[in-house]
């Protein structure tokens, strides 16, 4: 069983279910899969980032394999996604919110666990981001999509912000659920505001064809 403090464990399990449901719904949207494929991809989304984190901080076996609640909630999210997949178009807003919830909670938990393992500030922030985006990256790769974290839109940046707030509050001696929720809220708000206003991370300038190529219409 997990040895996390109860408030952080509750946050971690919430993110696990949210990412399991979101990951499975995203998989249904991207590829035609049977129930096994949907559940497996939901579990990969929910557990993949945490497994990568635990391997990197040498916390083995990973927490996802030691506590039945993690894989049970991830699988439950996948099964629920399969059950409601016929209403996928109407669920688009829910998919977006669930993704932001999972991203936020995992960024906070990942950074917190990295600090507990003795990592310095910058590595802890990076592990927070890896925890948040790792599972979704594996899922997207398996269904043949460019991973969400590599496409336009704010994704890794909100996770980094949430991890940074977690590190800052911990380093100043502020712990517990209020601090974790505050850090998660920062990540969630940046992600949702970025989507609402269409804010993207900086992109390289477009390359223009040499010679007499036609100009793109704006």
UniProtKB/Swiss-Prot annotation:
Lipid bilayer topology: Multi-pass membrane protein
GO cellular component: plasma membrane
Residue ranges of coiled coil: none
Keyword Cell membrane carried by entry: yes
Source species, domain of life: Bacteria
Transmembrane segments annotated in the record for this chain: 8-28, 37-57, 64-84, 91-111, 118-138, 154-174, 179-199
Database matches in PANTHER family: INNER MEMBRANE PROTEIN, UPF0126 INNER MEMBRANE PROTEIN YADS-RELATED
Name of this chain's protein: UPF0126 membrane protein SCO4104
């Amino acid at each position: 069983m997990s040895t996390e403090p109860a408030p952080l464990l509750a946050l971690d399990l919430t993110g696990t279910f949210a990412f399991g449901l979101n990951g499975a719904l995203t998989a249904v949207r991207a590829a035609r899969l049977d129930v096994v494929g949907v559940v497996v991809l939901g579990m990969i989304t929910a557990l993949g980032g945490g497994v990568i984190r635990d391997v990197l901080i040498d916390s083995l076996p990973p927490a996802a394999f030691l506590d039945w609640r993690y894989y049970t909630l991830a699988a439950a999210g996948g099964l629920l996604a399969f059950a409601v997949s016929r209403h996928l178009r109407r669920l688009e807003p829910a998919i977006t919110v669930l993704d932001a919830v999972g991203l936020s909670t995992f960024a906070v938990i990942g950074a917190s666990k990295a600090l507990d393992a003795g990592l310095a500030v910058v590595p802890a922030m990076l592990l927070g981001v890896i925890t948040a985006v790792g599972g979704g990256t594996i899922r997207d790769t398996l269904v043949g999509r460019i991973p969400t974290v590599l496409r336009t839109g704010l994704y890794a940046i909100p996770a980094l912000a949430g991890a940074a707030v977690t590190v800052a509050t911990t380093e100043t001696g502020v712990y517990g659920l209020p601090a974790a929720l505050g850090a998660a809220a920062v990540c969630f708000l940046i992600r949702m505001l970025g989507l609402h206003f269409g804010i993207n991370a900086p992109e390289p300038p477009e390359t223009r064809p040499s010679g007499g190529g036609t100009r793109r219409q704006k």
